[in-house]
């Protein structure tokens, strides 16, 4: 596998894990994204970490600085607190663990000369009823590789080439118990602390702006439902036909993406038969909405005017040609009548 740039790695992890695994309304999450490269010729350090609370970046760390740096205003005053120091120590420990794991995986693949990448996502989710779910996953060279199972203290291999590492790690029961303790105890406690710090910021809810647009290309009519400027990012979008839910395979969806201003955006497209656009409705659910929001495509006034003008011109043209045809027929009839009178006069 060739070198990968920093943005490609980041979005690989973010889109395949955070965006793909949307959270239920009123849940909260703490996620750490680790990434690194065996060679330094493509913009990635040996280890880099990003921490997110409810999709909000709050901390960054890399192998060169070995320092946790705040990335959100609501944690700036915590740089010298005991909990922040504990977080910094955890990141330093993960730095060392990541590098050891990286070399282990490369050795088990007999990879030593080429440039390779390792990605890790770990963290927890806390639901409204205080139930928790932990996750700890590894990706190697951009592909799912290993996943930790806290219930059984073992590892699940996502591909056959991960089996050697799986068996090697499962021998170390102490590490497995430490992983489970973090996911089930330390991570939820850390999340609660961060939620308290971010109160008023992390608990804000911005409802989406929803609109449906109409596109025609290559004789295919497509309706696109756009949800813009919403927060948090967990959102549900679906198409209804005659007010009834449709099969999701009929629609083309876009991952939830950041808008660049702290909010998110997404869209869902559907190909429809021409002339039946009004039978389709886009339904959107979001924590910022009291009830599901629906939207349909409404032809713009300009389109209506253009259609009306074209129709009017067509009618006028038809009437004009009918008038000309009528006058021609009348002239022909008049000419035939005059000719008949002339012939009769000759006979007399």
Curated annotation (Swiss-Prot):
Disulfide linkage: 124-187, 225-282
GO molecular function annotations of the record: transferrin receptor binding
Membrane topology value: Single-pass type I membrane protein
All copies of domain Ig-like C1-type, residue ranges: 207-296
Record region (Alpha-3): 206-297
Transferase is among the record's keywords: no
Regions of this protein lying in the Extracellular compartment: 23-306
GO biological process terms on file: iron ion transport; regulation of iron ion transport; response to iron ion starvation
Pfam families xref list: C1-set (PF07654), MHC_I (PF00129)
Keywords assigned by UniProt, alphabetized: Cell membrane, Disulfide bond, Glycoprotein, Ion transport, Iron, Iron transport, Membrane, Signal, Transmembrane, Transmembrane helix, Transport
Function description: Binds to transferrin receptor (TFR) and reduces its affinity for iron-loaded transferrin.
Similarity remark: Belongs to the MHC class I family.
Assembly notes: Binds TFR through the extracellular domain in a pH-dependent manner.
Protein's UniProt name: Hereditary hemochromatosis protein homolog
